[in-house]
Regions:
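Membrane-embedded alpha-helical signal segments
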Residues: 1-306, 310, 314-316, 323, ...
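Short polybasic/polar patches that bind polyanions
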Residues: 163, 204, 349, 376, ...
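Transmembrane alpha-helical segments that form the functional core of multipass membrane systems
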Residues: 253-254, 261, 267-400, 404-413
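Hydrophobic alpha-helical transmembrane segments of membrane transport and translocation systems
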Residues: 383-455
């Protein structure tokens, strides 16, 4: 919960300005601007952040203020805001907490001698990029726009798709130092009221200094999971059409300022696996894509542990599948081969992420080919193991959720170790543990991963 300043604007102009000058580091911070001018023969002081304000808009507003005479000057701030400010977004603020928050978030606030309130003009122009297509959630047939780091742009992208008065977007904030804006979006006639109240209550009670990692910080603060539970509690998307579709299904979408993605809940593992592209094709094609992605995702968990189990018990393998047996000499136990390859694949992935864009693709290809070819020839790995690990590495990208991919990877590693140590019993126990992770893994809505009920 954010501790707010309870002091309010008084009738003394000098005391108000003195408090602002003491609170804001005007003398030390070059980007905090303090501008004095006369309006209708009375003193006024403007406060704003350099770089956030539209200079052209402020120039026109100040020019209009200079033409105000003493006879035309209204007696109170409320009347002044209605009659003398030629701008759209204007507020009258009486609490210093609201005033300071508005100044530090980029709006222009000014005091006029004789008024017991401050006037706020939202002339902000945040540095922002275009609403280009996300690099991760690419579309085959749908819209090509994506969320950006400015929260008001993101709400506009969803409002453009849902022109319904039942679409509510409530603004709140979290973080004592960061005061990060958070938008809770929902359809008032479709949302689960109990879930909505739970979410808003948790956000209001947050006691954090900042949301330095944006939505991930908010997710961890809203739902503190056990350290050994790798499964994500929220679905993230950078596509406005996906977020809008989830709103129409009765779900809650949370937007965080400075984050180019949306949090969606409640969610299940099938929600994590599905993509927006499934709905841009005919029903049969979309169903095929969903089923294929689900089966391949399941295969990434059980494929290599099952192969290891059969290699430890070759008598169980039917004759028709005898070609999958390892034919070359095994210099390194299969379990160590699998574990080393898991680590090597992560190494290649991290190297590709930290390599300059123009070099990442060729270097990844060269490294993969060279390491794969020479590691087999040198006897470190068997070619069959390399083939099956290559399938698992590629298949892991068939589902769009990065965090879910690592959760499934940890389940696969657990199965590999248990199978190598305890053979069939270890594999069975590992399968039971994976199922328990899914069944007993509760989300913020109180449902488990296998509960696909919407509302």
């Amino acid at each position: 919960m954010i501790k707010k300043i309870k002091k309010e604007v008084g009738c003394s102009f000098k005391e108000n300005i003195q408090y602002m000058d003491q609170t804001l580091p005007v003398e030390k911070s070059f980007d905090i601007i303090r501008r004095e001018m006369e309006i209708g023969g009375k003193e006024s002081v403007f406060y704003y952040i350099d770089g956030f304000i539209k200079d052209e808009a402020m120039l026109k507003i100040m020019d209009s203020f200079l033409s105000i005479t003493a006879e035309d000057l209204p007696q109170d701030a409320e009347t002044f805001s209605k009659q003398k400010i030629p701008y759209v977004e204007v507020d009258v603020l009486k609490c210093f907490d609201d005033i300071l928050r508005n100044v530090l978030s980029g709006t222009a606030v000014f005091f006029v001698d004789g008024y017991d309130a401050a006037l706020c003009m939202d002339c902000r122009s945040y540095p922002a990029r275009g609403v280009d297509e996300p690099d991760k959630d690419k579309s085959l047939r749908g819209s090509r726009d994506g969320f950006v780091e400015t929260i008001v742009f993101n709400t506009a992208l969803m409002r453009r798709r849902i022109r319904d008065p039942h679409l509510i977007m409530e603004m709140t904030e979290a973080g004592q130092s960061s005061r990060t804006d958070i938008a809770v979006c929902y359809m008032s006639d479709r949302v689960d009221k109990e879930l909505l109240n739970n979410i808003k209550s948790r956000i209001e009670k947050l006691e954090v200094d900042d949301l330095r990692m944006n939505q991930q910080s908010l997710a961890e603060a809203l739902f503190k999971r056990k350290w050994f539970n790798p499964f994500p509690k929220f679905k993230f998307t950078e596509r406005p059409d996906t977020a809008a579709a989830c709103l129409l299904e009765g779900k809650v979408v949370i937007l965080v300022d400075n984050s180019p993605s949306a949090m969606i809940l409640p969610t299940s593992i099938l929600d994590m696996i599905e993509e927006a592209n499934d709905y841009y094709f005919p029903t049969l094609t979309g169903m095929y894509l969903k089923i294929s992605r689900t089966l391949i995702t399941i295969a990434t968990v059980f494929f290599t542990p099952l192969y290891l189990l059969y290699m430890q018990n070759p008598q169980w393998l039917p004759g028709v599948f005898s070609f999958v047996m390892v034919r070359d000499q095994i210099n390194l136990p299969l379990i160590w081969q699998f574990l080393l390859l898991e680590l090597s694949i992560d190494g290649l992935r991290l190297a590709a992420m930290n390599t300059p864009t123009m070099l990442s693709t060729p270097l990844s290809v060269i490294a993969g080919i060279v390491m794969g070819e020479f590691s087999v020839e040198s006897g470190w790995f068997n070619s069959e193991v390399m083939l099956y690990m290559a399938f698992v590495a590629v298949a892991n990208y068939t589902q769009p959720n990065f965090e879910l991919g690592y959760a499934l990877k940890f389940m696969r590693l657990m199965l590999l170790v248990l199978t190598a140590v305890f053979n069939l019993y270890g594999f069975v126990v590992g399968c039971i543990l994976v199922l328990c992770f899914l069944v007993f893994n509760k989300t913020l809505s109180g449902r488990n991963y296998l509960n696909v009920k919407i509302n």
